[in-house]
Amino acid sequence: MKIAQIAPLMESVPPRLYGGTERVVSYLTDELVHLGHDVTLFASGDSISSAKLVRCVPMALRLDANVSDPIPYYMLMLDRMRELADEFDILHFHIDQFHFPLFRLIAHRTLTTLHGRQDLHDLKALYVGFSDMPLVAISNAQRKPIANANFVGTVHHGIPVHLLKPTYNRGQYVAFLGRISPEKRPDRAIGSPGRSTFPSRSRPRSTKLMKPISAQRSRRF
């Protein structure tokens, strides 16, 4: 099967730094190649993949000091995708809903995995208007705010099983790794150790000014 994987342009695939979506796209793409599919990855030029790579921008937009607005680059990528669409059996999008208007006429050959939060009020109208676009959720909880959207399944995010091995020895602290934003609930990660015998440590990422998220000052960052 000829498959196009359309990745976000903000980070490379796989990401050099933070980039949960790009990391999942990398794992999925490489596994599809391993299974024998003919896969083409549309991503930033600094991406590394076993699939054929179409370099839509020279480098990850977040790391390009000359880029202030990513939207024009997504528009150019989607126009290129529109021209090449007939070459693929399936076009798998990982860029939210940017592509909906351009690819509606071939919706049956597209798949859109929603990697972010879907509980924003205005999204309901969008999914009603584009009810023919097939969607994949990354959890059943993600589907609840837009339960009537055109979901064809839930595929939980996963990683290759050999990457991490569990340890059953008692640790010394609870770690929070992730982006500091309301939907990630870092406040729960910081507050939970206070109800146990474990201290907490955080490795946050934030591109905006960080405001105090806890009255407790004993947390290590």
Regions found by a protein language model. Give the residues of each.
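Catalytic cores of nucleotide-sugar-dependent glycosyltransferases that transfer UDP/GDP/TDP-activated
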Residues: 1-221
